[in-house]
């Protein structure tokens, strides 16, 4: 009878107890794995924020991890703001420098205009004095180049008169009479065609 009892199969009650004891053991490893994963993720987040050089390390780690789109957007926004600030600074510097250069150009133009007016005025005064010396006809309307050519011809005419000794000592002593006679002679010389021929050359 003892052999029959030992060799008898396990009762259903004992089998259910053993199965119920094994089921918690089987269910525990997955929960342990999940808890380990949660603990690892919490350790990673805590290590990124509170480790040595946490701010710098967290920034570098966030940039390296592909699964952080929020940090990438923040980086882009900060970079865009920095670029706009630098561009605004450049615009302010260029805007501050442009009025000075414009004022300098204006002053240079004004000074150049003043110098040009002074030069033109002095030149006109010199030609007016030269026209008073050269014997001219009432109908003459000489330009500046014609006045210079006429003055050169008048100097040449005076040289020829002095070389020919046509004037006596009495006429030479009276400057007014000599000037009138030379003016008349030069006018005749012009009317004869010498001036028109010389002006054409």
Curated annotation (Swiss-Prot):
Origin species: Macaca tonkeana (Tonkean macaque)
Cellular compartments annotated: Nucleus
Domain of life: Eukaryota
GO MF annotation list: DNA-binding transcription factor activity, RNA polymerase II-specific; protein dimerization activity; RNA polymerase II transcription regulatory region sequence-specific DNA binding
Alphabetical UniProt keywords: Activator, Biological rhythms, Developmental protein, Differentiation, DNA-binding, Myogenesis, Nucleus, Repressor, Transcription, Transcription regulation
Primary role: Acts as a transcriptional regulator. Inhibits myogenesis by sequestrating E proteins, inhibiting trans-activation by MEF2, and inhibiting DNA-binding by MYOD1 through physical interaction. This interaction probably involves the basic domains of both proteins. Also represses expression of pro-inflammatory cytokines such as TNFA and IL1B. Regulates cranial suture patterning and fusion. Activates transcription as a heterodimer with E proteins. Regulates gene expression differentially, depending on dimer composition.
Composition-biased stretches (Basic residues): 34-43
GO cellular component, one term: nucleus
Gene: TWIST1
InterPro entries hit by this protein: bHLH_dom, E-box_TF_Regulators, HLH_DNA-bd_sf, TWIST1_bHLH
Residue span of region Sufficient for transactivation activity: 160-190
GO biological process: cell differentiation; muscle organ development; negative regulation of DNA-templated transcription; rhythmic process
Record's compositionally biased regions (Low complexity): 1-18
Residues covered by the bHLH domain: 107-158
Name used for this protein in its record: Twist-related protein 1
Secretion signal, residue range per the UniProt entry: none
Subunit structure: Efficient DNA binding requires dimerization with another bHLH protein. Homodimer or heterodimer with E proteins such as TCF3. ID1 binds preferentially to TCF3 but does not interact efficiently with TWIST1 so ID1 levels control the amount of TCF3 available to dimerize with TWIST and thus determine the type of dimer formed.
Pfam families: HLH
Chief place where the protein resides: nucleus
Annotated stretches, region: Disordered: 1-104
Gly residues composition-biased segments: 46-65, 80-98
